[in-house]
Design a protein with these regions (language model features):
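Conserved small-residue
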Residues: 17-19, 24, 76, 103, ...
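Active-site core segments that coordinate phosphate-bearing ligands/cofactors
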Residues: 5-7, 114-131, 137-172, 182-198, ...
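N-terminal glycine/serine-rich phosphate-binding loop of ATP-dependent small-molecule kinases
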Residues: 1-97, 124, 226-227, 231, ...
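Pocket-flanking alpha-helical
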Residues: 87, 108-112, 247-249
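Residue-level signal for inorganic ion chemistry
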Residues: 24, 47, 76, 103, ...
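Short, acidic/turn-prone active-site loops that include or flank metal/cofactor-
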Residues: 32, 37, 99-106, 178, ...
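Short beta-strand-loop/turn "lid" adjacent to the catalytic site in phosphate-handling enzymes
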Residues: 64-101, 129-133, 164-185, 210-215
Length: 509
């Protein structure tokens, strides 16, 4: 009997291919960085064919490194970042570059809808706020600026769906991706026709993909894909789920009193609810595939991607290589330095808005002095990113329909660092748990494969076997009080500096 599961996860910055055994042990991984294209100001895109080639190459590398016979792969499942767009023809081939969820070209469309009173009404139809990186605004923009693309498109897909189409030819999506994209009435699992007619998207309505369960087997690895990946032709391919949901599932989030925090490229913060949140519409809301819950999410591009930029652009590859030579990741090395300076005073504030913040705020440091060193700077980066998460979490936990959380499941890059994980506990004042294995998106979608192949009856059962808490952190009351004071300074600085950014934007125009 085939004993391995393969999870593919194409995120905003990195694609990961991860091998798991039947009980969820992470056996090996191969990674490829995803280049981002900037064809015009505010436009962020990806070459779909290059992404597929890189993923296929990573699969070959992983199979070779792990010396795994492809016949031992029971099934392959996929995950990927949510929202954005991948438009394909009848053969599953891209008709234009993929659009990232960080794309801002639809800002004018969203502003028009807001002025006309369409945003809230149609947000209620899909149980979440409308925002620029979602397909609705992007499709309207394409209708206005690239009308030929409308005719060339057979189906509107999302990142994971494009990869799956290359694997087996299936053209569909699942409830989590369609829901997170803001195209779906998540209570009915149906595309609301009024939404498309009122927003001028009627020409796209018939191009929306059919929707199925994340745990369905939808095809088999084709002969062509087998040549590209070294997978066995005929290997079952499972539909999979969007990365936000996959990470929550792989973190073992099963109760409304748990807060899922993903500190990766984006700050992603989610809670479970017995019915959709409607009093305070969240940024994202989907039907959760475990326990009959709905997953409500607030987020921003203000998380560990700021630290990764610092490592790449300021520390440079030599520092990363030096850490590796000591058997450390750069997260471990920087966390170790931060741990050495936590007891000394540090008033530096870092605003982690390299990829955009409130009122268009850019990133920056406040309070630097000559006596500060690199460890103080990294500490400020760690703290600023946790504070940005708290901004999102404060919004998520507002309103009478909020969840009452008692603990946190932390995933993403920050979870690799014990010092950073403890900082999340101290800032948020809640116990933090980190589960085994670092690649939660790939693990969550591999769990879909495990259910599809009959290893477990459902995802609830798969979570009991394939998710294990590895580390836990308790908040320190004194540090929590000190961090709340510093967080007040952080929010004050963000609000006070807001008027400065509009003139800067105008100067760039």
């Amino acid at each position: 009997m085939a004993q391995y599961l393969l999870g593919l996860d194409a995120g905003s910055t990195m694609s990961k291919v991860v091998l798991f055994d039947r009980v969820g042990n992470e056996l090996g991984a191969a990674r490829r960085r995803n280049p981002i294209l900037f064809p015009a100001p505010g436009h962020t895109e990806r070459d779909p064919q290059a992404m597929w080639r890189d993923v296929a190459d990573a699969v070959r590398e992983l199979l070779a490194e792990q010396q795994v016979d492809a016949a031992e792969i029971a099934a392959v499942s996929v995950s990927g970042y949510g929202a954005g767009l991948y438009l394909v023809d009848r053969h599953g081939q891209a008709v234009r570059p993929g659009v990232m969820s960080t794309d801002g070209r639809a800002a004018g469309v969203l502003a028009h809808w807001e002025r006309d009173g369409l945003s809230h009404r149609n947000g209620m139809r899909t149980q979440q706020r409308l925002w620029t990186g979602q397909p609705a605004g992007l499709l309207r923009w394409l209708s206005q600026h690239e009308p030929a693309v409308v005719d060339a498109t057979h189906a509107v897909l999302f990142c994971k769906d494009y990869l799956r189409a290359q694997l087996c030819g299936d053209i569909s999506t699942d409830t989590t991706d369609a829901g997170l994209a803001g195209l779906l009435d998540v209570t009915r699992t149906a595309y609301p026709d009024e939404f498309y007619s009122e927003l001028g998207l009627a020409g796209w309505r018939d191009k929306l993909p059919r929707i199925g369960a994340s745990t369905d087997i939808v095809g088999k690895v084709s002969a062509k894909a087998a040549l590209s990946t070294n997978l066995r032709a005929g290997t079952p391919v499972v539909r999979g789920m969007v990365d936000v949901c996959a990470a929550a599932v792989a973190s073992g989030v099963t109760r409304p009193d748990q807060l899922s925090v993903i500190a990766g490229t984006f700050s992603i913060n989610s809670t479970l609810h017995t019915s959709p949140r409607l009093e305070t519409l969240p940024l994202l809301q989907i039907a959760y595939p475990v326990g009959g819950y709905y997953l409500a999410t607030e987020g921003s591009p203000s998380s560990a991607s700021n630290f990764e930029w610092y490592c790449k652009s300021i520390l440079g590859p030599d520092s990363v290589a030096a850490a590796a030579s000591r058997g450390q990741s750069i997260y471990d090395a920087c966390g170790e330095r931060v741990g050495q300076v936590l007891q000394r005073p540090n008033d530096i504030l870092f605003l982690p808005f390299l990829f955009g913040g409130p009122c268009g705020a850019p990133a920056g440091f406040l309070g630097l002095r000559a006596e500060h060193d690199g460890a103080d700077v990294v500490r400020a980066i760690f703290e600023g990113i946790v504070f940005a998460h708290k901004l999102d979490i404060d919004l998520l936990l507002s309103g009478s329909d909020r969840a009452e959380v008692r603990s946190i499941r932390l995933a993403g890059g920050a979870a690799r660092s014990p010092v950073w994980s403890q900082m999340f506990a101290d800032v948020l004042g809640l116990p933090v748990e980190v589960t085994q294995g670092g690649e939660v998106g790939a693990r969550g979608t591999a769990m879909c494969a495990a259910v599809a192949m009959g290893l477990y009856p459902d995802l609830d059962a798969a979570m009991l076997s394939m998710v294990r808490v590895e580390r836990s952190y308790q908040p320190d009351a004194a540090r929590h009080a000190a961090y709340l004071h510093k967080y007040e300074r952080f929010t004050l600085a963000t609000r006070t500096l807001a008027p400065l950014w509009q003139p800067t934007d105008e100067a760039r125009a």
